[in-house]
Every structure is written in C-alpha cells, then in structure tokens.
Amino acid sequence: MTKGSVFIIMGPPGSGKGTQSQYLANRIGLPHISTGDLLRAIIREGTPNGLKAKAYLDKGAFVPSDFVWEILKEKLQSQACSKGCIIDGFPRTLDQAHLLDSFLMDVHSNYTVIFLEISEDEILKRVCSRFLCPSCSRIYNTSQGHTECPDCHVPLIRRSDDTPEIIKERLTKYQERTAPVIAYYDSLGKLCRVSSENKEDLVFEDILKCIYK
C-alpha cells in the first residue's frame, strides 16, 4: 500500500457494515476488505488457521487480535490496495486500532472512520432474518425473497452464529471491547456517526456526506 485513502466502516453486528462497504467500493472504485470474509474464506479452505477461526466464531467469540491482524495486513500490502481500500470489521479493540494506525502512518495513508449506529432491537430483527451466499459471502434478507444467490446460483445458508443467544453475547462483548475504539477515533477527530436504521440508500447518502464534507 502506498499513499491513499482508507475508509474504516464500524458498527455492531447487523448494522449493515458489509452492505454499505460494498456500496462505497462500487462508488469510489476502491477494494472492500471484510475481515469476516477473509476469515470465512480460510474456514472454507479447511486450513489449520481456518479450523481455529471456526472454533471462535461458532461460539460467538472474538478471534484473537494478532491472528486477525496478520491476515488483514497481508491483504493491505497487496497491489490491489495500493491506492487505498475500505475496511469492514476491523479494528474491534484498542490494540487493533493502534496496530492499524501504526501501519497507516508508515505508508502515509489518510483515513476516515464511519460508525454505523443502530438499536439492539433492530439488530436482532435484521440478524435473525438474514442469509448468506456460501460462495461470494453476500448477505440477503428474507424480505428479498431469495432462496439462492442470483449471481452464484447456489442455495443461501444461515450463518451458524446468527442466533439471538449468540448475537446478544456478541453485542455485550462488542460494547465492552469496541466502545473504547469509537471513543479513541472520536478523540482524534476521525469519526463520523451515521444512523443505519434508515433505508440502505439513505444510509449510503449520509456516508457520502461524511466523506465529501
């Protein structure tokens, strides 16, 4: 990665990070890097690291910082990210935020953090009605009426960690570990808050206002 623009999309599970990150990637032409997708990819490959990641995710636990960081850093150093990128799902702890800050300073990249705000009730409603394409990892909602991915033509599946019990546990851990990260970026003047309870297109308009203000 050389000097460029990096956009970090943050928010609790079910806030629409992946959807909005992909909208932004399509609009500004930068690659979308999802740590969740990176982890699910190595899980599908069945590597030792993939099996380790699966054990954490299946019980709703966070994957260790150093483990996630090494996977993400390799992606950030690729040619695809030479002009910048959109990061979704990282950082989740202050340690991760400091690792990413140090890396971005070394390569002289500017960055903006978009924080998607959403209530717990709305999160539970969304997460319990979403399905995943096992091939491309795109998320679909039951209200869309899809039973298979329109692009990959494979049946949609429900993620093993998309249950009310696991989501509530993840939200508790999220508040404990990620709330300080939000405060940290806010103190640096890097944070822009956006409500993600509106329709997807309206949320995206608010994100663009943050970027171009």
From Swiss-Prot:
Its EC number is 2.7.4.3. AMP binds at T35, R40, A61, F62, V63, G89, F90, P91, R92, Q96, R159, R170. Keywords: ATP-binding, Cytoplasm, Kinase, Metal-binding, Nucleotide biosynthesis, Nucleotide-binding, Transferase, Zinc. It is found in: Cytoplasm. ATP binds at G14, S15, G16, K17, G18, T19, R130, I139, Y140, N198. GO terms for cellular component: cytoplasm. It comes from the Bacteria. PROSITE patterns: ADENYLATE_KINASE. Zn(2+) binds at C133, C136, C149, C152. HAMAP family: Adenylate_kinase_Adk. This is Adenylate kinase. It comes from Chlamydia pneumoniae. The gene is adk.
